[in-house]
């Protein structure tokens, strides 16, 4: 692969992930997975592990930073757990793609996710989560919410003195434990009355509560503000209510940046639930619509691979009788399918027949 060059964000049609799929059966084997140092000893006990892709390599992400990611990076997340009433370990492995991650990083993260599954004897349910479109399962891993900062991890989280600090605007949105904290451009167009924002000016911190914001967003922002003050010592903070402050306030006059077209939630509420049979037997990706609307487990055939797309999640169901290559290519199939839809960034969940997936069962029943 060529060197890492920052590409146009989420330019899925130019991504080479589709090509990555055709090579998986040949190159992702248990033997090669055993040679990856990052996988040594993983999946042997219940818990969460996270890695970041750095120069095509899998590097361990510090546990203290779990739940904090950079939009310029790609990560792999492994959750090891036990199903109720069972002793054997079960696995969900995700790769998370930042909005400014490169195409190369995207492909390496996808490839290594499949390799990790091979290391775990193909026992994992595979997921793709894109920034701004994370699944509820992904968000559930982080009790303190998900924090997404601009740039890459080489910038560090807490290594800048307050007097040298570059102003930033943090957006708090969500409910209960599913609060997402995201750094957004310093521009007034980013403000939303139903959310909470923190303006970080280094020694001065403002919490802006939108008129329609909820108590969970306000509480999370307050906690975040307290942590920033504790880190910086001399910093002062003030809480502002949208309906009570004038546009001449420093909070507003500090928002002088330009807006960017960052990815938003792409859930397609108008989408019709669709079941497709997929294959690459002819040497290229091919999908055939089997059914739309009401879909049942009886519509699935264990000899094939199917995609179930309901507009909010793209499920890949792999039958036990599918070929080895088809079993490996689930993520590539889903990527190729989603490229052609209005919702290319929705979560992907790939699992095999017999693996427990409450999300898939719920999608069938809906």
Swiss-Prot record:
Domain of life: Eukaryota
One GO CC term, this protein: actin cytoskeleton
Keyword Signal: no
Keyword Repeat: yes
Annotated InterPro entries: ADF-H/Gelsolin-like_dom_sf, Gelsolin-like_dom, Gelsolin-like_dom_sf, Villin/Gelsolin
Residue windows of the Gelsolin-like repeats: 55-139, 177-252, 286-327
Tissue: Expressed in circular and longitudinal muscle, pseudohearts, pharynx and gizzard. Not expressed in seminal vesicles.
Record localization: Cytoplasm, Cytoskeleton
Biological process (GO), any one: actin polymerization or depolymerization
GO molecular function: actin filament binding
Alphabetically ordered keywords of this record: Actin capping, Actin-binding, Calcium, Cytoplasm, Cytoskeleton, Repeat
Region (Actin binding): 100-116
Subunit and partners: Interacts with actin monomers and filaments.
Family: Belongs to the villin/gelsolin family.
Function summary: Calcium-regulated protein that binds to the plus (or barbed) ends of actin monomers or filaments, preventing monomer exchange (end-blocking or capping). Can promote the assembly of monomers into filaments (nucleation) as well as sever existing filaments.
Name assigned to this protein: Gelsolin-like protein 2
UniProt source species: Lumbricus terrestris
Lineage, opening ranks: Eukaryota, Metazoa, Spiralia, Lophotrochozoa, Annelida
